[in-house]
Structures are given as C-alpha cells and as structure tokens.
Swiss-Prot record:
Organism: Lawsonia intracellularis (strain PHE/MN1-00)
Family: Belongs to the SmpB family.
Upper classification of the organism: Bacteria, Pseudomonadati, Thermodesulfobacteriota, Desulfovibrionia, Desulfovibrionales
Function: Required for rescue of stalled ribosomes mediated by trans-translation. Binds to transfer-messenger RNA (tmRNA), required for stable association of tmRNA with ribosomes. tmRNA and SmpB together mimic tRNA shape, replacing the anticodon stem-loop with SmpB. tmRNA is encoded by the ssrA gene; the 2 termini fold to resemble tRNA(Ala) and it encodes a 'tag peptide', a short internal open reading frame. During trans-translation Ala-aminoacylated tmRNA acts like a tRNA, entering the A-site of stalled ribosomes, displacing the stalled mRNA.
PROSITE patterns: SSRP (PS01317)
Cell compartment(s), UniProt: Cytoplasm
Organism domain of life: Bacteria
Protein's UniProt name: SsrA-binding protein
Main location group: cytoplasm
UniProt cross-references to Pfam families, sorted A to Z: SmpB
Gene: smpB
C-alpha cells in the first residue's frame, strides 16, 4: 500500500517569482469558512495582485480571490475579503519590522492542503525593476546556450 501524501498543492503564484526577488520563506495557516475550503478543494482561487498587510498586530492576506462555492446554500461570502494569517507572535513581529523597510513586501507563493488544513507559503520579497527582468532573461538564455553546446559536444 502506498503512503499517503501529506500535502496537496492547490495554487501557485508563478508570477511572483518573476516580479520579485524572494528573500525569506514562511508557512502560515489561513482562517477560512467551510464553503471557502470546499471552493478551494474544487480548484477555484486566484492570487492576482495579492499581498500580506498588517493591522493591529495581525497579518491578513489581501487580494486572494476565492469564489463562492456553488452548493453553499444561502451563505453569501465576499470572495475578496481579507483573510487572517495564522502565525506565531515572533514571526509576525519579524515580518512587520522588515516590511517597514523601503521596497520590501510580503507575497503569497503557494496555497495547499497539509494534513487537511489549508496552508500558504509566504515570502518576504523585494520588487524587481524592468531592467532586472531583462537581465534575468539574458542569464537564462545564456545558460540554455551553454547547456546546448555541452549536449552537442557529448553526442
């Protein structure tokens, strides 16, 4: 019998890896309602322009769109409401102090189930400029050219 998987990836924010230099990673829980969890299990969510904001010493993920679950009944939820992150007090203080620095933000990278609980991977990030994107693309192209040349030599 095969071992059960403990985590199941629901969504990944690939665009964040392109737009930001990721510095520090953390795993956090999210406070959700039942219909929101069911909507996630059915594969509906969007990370478009989401980030983490701090209010009254608590972390909230803003911009995470979870559409209403079709069979939720009469319960009507705001799909774009801020959702509280479950982090230790020390982690919250550390992140809040780093976000106050100019140019740093916190972005969600992944949304997944771990032991039947919804978790998100968040990262402390610094925004890239347009020329940084171009430099990154040049580096990737050069690396691919080198790989092609090495592969051609070994044949």
């Amino acid at each position: 019998m095969s071992a059960k998987k403990n985590s199941h990836l629901v969504f990944e924010n690939r665009k964040a890896r392109h737009l930001y230099d990721l510095l520090d990673f953390l795993e956090a829980g999210i406070v959700l309602t039942g219909p929101e969890v069911k909507s996630l299990r059915s594969g509906h969510a969007s990370f478009q322009d989401s980030y983490v904001d701090f209010k009254q010493g608590e972390g909230y993920i803003v911009g995470l769109h979870i559409p209403p679950y079709n069979n939720a009944g009469y319960v009507i939820q705001n799909p774009d409401r801020p959702r509280k992150l479950l982090l230790h007090r020390q982690e919250l203080k550390m992140l809040a102090s780093k976000v106050e620095q100019k140019g740093l933000t916190i972005v969600p990278l992944k949304l997944y189930f771990k032991n039947r609980k919804v978790k998100t991977e968040i990262a402390l990030a610094k925004g890239r400029k347009l020329y940084d994107h171009r430099n990154e693309l040049k580096k990737r192209a050069e690396a691919m050219d080198i790989k092609r040349e090495l592969a051609a030599r070994h044949l």
